[in-house]
Amino acid sequence: MSERTVTVSQLTNYLKNLLLQDHNLKNVLVRGEISNFKHHSSGHMYFTLKDEGASLRCVMFRNRNWNLDFSPQDGMDVIVQGVVGIFERAGLYQLYVEKMYSHGLGSLHLAFEQLKEKLAEEGIFNEEYKKTLPPFPKKIAVVTSPTGAAVRDMIVTISRRFPLTSILLIPVRVQGEYAASEIRAGIDYANSIDDIDVILVGRGGGSLEEIWPFNTEEVARAIFSSKAPVISCVGHETDFTISDFVSDLRAPTPTAAAELVVPDQVELKRQVSDYKHRLTKALYHKYRNLDQRVVELLDRPVMKNPYTLISERKKELEYLDQRLLREVYHLFKLKRNKYSSLVEQLDSLSPLKTLGRGYTFCQTHDGDIVRSVTDIEQEDILKLTFFDGSAKCLVKEKQEHHISEDHSNLNSLCNEEEDYDRQ
């Protein structure tokens, strides 16, 4: 054992934290007999809960007891729900009561809390399983007593609000020993009908014992398994039943359920009238804008005298046509002149041009070009090409001229060529 010394406060805080960390003590249900009850002027209630073998100090603060539907007294058998903690100043453990159920109803409240906790752990109450109600149901099944005021209120309200909806009454007992099984069977029967859109399950108000069938597990599971959406409508506004938690929608009263399940035809007519007015107004503004647009278009010069615009465009087209012809002709002329210049250049470089000035092109019989008199011999046959034809010649005689000789012969030949060109 540790020899470290602690203070009373430290030990008390340690024990307090131990109790707070214990999950089983955070939401505990305790049954016992009230003794030493005191309702303090502050509004808080102080009492002891006891049985044959032990007693437990309890406190129920004002913000928890203000809505109790009974007055606790000594000797009363109750079930309380709360958290176990330590009152540090006195060093005593006690129960901080959150809820209290009166004599005779304690077992029912206990059963209610236990079933609620069980189904909650299974996830049956989760929002992910809630089905959406159709906006305009065609057929509604009502599972309730055929003789109570609740069914009359629902039928009258549904017929008044949305007469297009048909109602199927499935009569069942809503209190007593066999009520739960009949309610479950009624829900199952409604689901066997293909065209049922919504199921209303409920009754008018009553005591806890009277509405107890709606706190049973078989009714809860029937609601959860329903293919059609279910509205729970037990006529009690302050407390909830298990059916309220598991259903797709909870209504505080049967009449409220009827108002929730169908739209109000008066409101629908008002909405249709409003939509009609808005549509008419939108169409009128659209028509007016289009009409104004037409007036503006008709007021334009092109619409007043379209032939003037056509005549102007025709003149522009003719002008562009003439301009195009001039440009094409000018471009053609430039290309033709350039072509003629190139032809003249090519012609000036042509051998035929030289032959046309009196020269000839000489080849041997084998086609070799004769560049000098030394390339031929007597009796050779030569081919002479002129600018306008050719001829074959036989060499009878050849004469050689030396380069060193007087240039007079060359000048004479040049003068002869110039005379020939002038001619």
Curated annotation (Swiss-Prot):
Pfam families cross-referenced by the UniProt entry: Exonuc_VII_L (PF02601), tRNA_anti_2 (PF13742)
Sections of the chain in a coiled coil: none
One term of GO molecular function: exodeoxyribonuclease VII activity
Reaction equations catalysed: Exonucleolytic cleavage in either 5'- to 3'- or 3'- to 5'-direction to yield nucleoside 5'-phosphates
The enzyme's E.C. designation: 3.1.11.6
GO cellular component, one term: cytoplasm
Keyword line: Cytoplasm, Exonuclease, Hydrolase, Nuclease
Domain of life: Bacteria
Family matches, as InterPro entries: Exonuc_VII_L, Exonuc_VII_lsu_C, OB-fold_nuc-bd_dom
Role description: Bidirectionally degrades single-stranded DNA into large acid-insoluble oligonucleotides, which are then degraded further into small acid-soluble oligonucleotides.
Family, as annotated: Belongs to the XseA family.
Protein's recorded name: Exodeoxyribonuclease 7 large subunit
Name of the gene this protein is made from: xseA
